[in-house]
Every structure is written in C-alpha cells, then in structure tokens.
C-alpha cells in the first residue's frame, strides 16, 4: 500500500470496497505472481491457488461501501468515469451504490467472462438508467442514458 501511495498524486483509501462497511475481509498474498496480486480468500480461485501454491500469508482488510468513500471525499453527484475491479465483489459494490444520489457517465466493470456475473451486472445497471456499450473478455462497459447521444 505504501508503494501505491508513493507513486500516486490522488487520494488512496486503505480499505476494501464492499457491500457493507466495517467488516474484516481476509485476503491472501499471492507472492510474486504479478497477474494475481492479492485475492479475497472466499473466492474459489483463491482457495485453489492457496492449496496449489501453499500460500500462507493472509491479512485482514476493513471494508467501506463505495457510497461511504464518495461522501468522505466529497465526490460530486455526477462522476464522469468509474472502473470497478474488486476481485469478485463487483456485484456487492454495485448493489450498495445509491444510484439516486450518484450518476456515473461511463462505467467499466470487471466480470472475467462470467455469464452469470454479466447478467447480474446488467440487471443492476439497466434498471438504474445505464445502457450496455461493449464487452471484452474481462470487462463490460455501460454509459448512462443522460450522456448517451
């Protein structure tokens, strides 16, 4: 985390974004595997990685909701762009957003080519005024109807 702070010029928030605040989530350190970094311990991918590679180090991270962070940093009600990549908890984050208070012009969400996850994301966003734009192997993009011209 300190390395991240050292190279950024924007605020860094030391927490995990989740559907509830104040929970301790366990993450495992995947060591030198730059592709995986750290993973939420409840993910099935993480469980298999832990077994296969004998990953031993884990740590707890306190959670905050996205709304809580937006309020804490006095975010405007309209945010041009947000990218959500939270290691399998994307739908948890989306379900906790107050879409009546915050509008995102364009949203990119990681879904790792998971059809079920894509369907849940689509239901949440389309019911809140977002229009599907594009998809690739890992991410799905939406634009808010107020900026789609």
Predicted regions and their residues:
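Phosphate/nucleotide-binding beta-alpha loop and adjacent structural elements of enzyme active sites
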Residues: 1-149
């Amino acid at each position: 985390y300190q390395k991240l702070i050292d190279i950024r010029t924007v605020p860094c928030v030391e927490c995990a974004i989740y559907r509830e605040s104040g929970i301790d989530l366990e993450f495992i350190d995947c060591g030198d595997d730059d592709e995986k970094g750290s993973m939420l311990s409840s993910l099935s991918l993480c469980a298999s990685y832990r077994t296969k590679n004998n990953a031993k180090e884990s740590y707890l991270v306190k959670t905050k909701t996205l709304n809580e962070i937006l309020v804490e940093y006095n975010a405007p009600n309209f945010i041009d762009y947000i990218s959500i990549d939270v290691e399998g908890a994307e739908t948890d984050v989306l379900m906790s957003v107050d879409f009546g208070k915050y509008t995102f012009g364009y949203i990119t969400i990681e879904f790792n080519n998971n059809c079920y996850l894509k369907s849940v994301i689509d239901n949440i966003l389309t019911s809140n005024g977002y229009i599907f734009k594009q998809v690739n192997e890992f991410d799905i993009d939406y634009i808010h109807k107020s900026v789609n011209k």
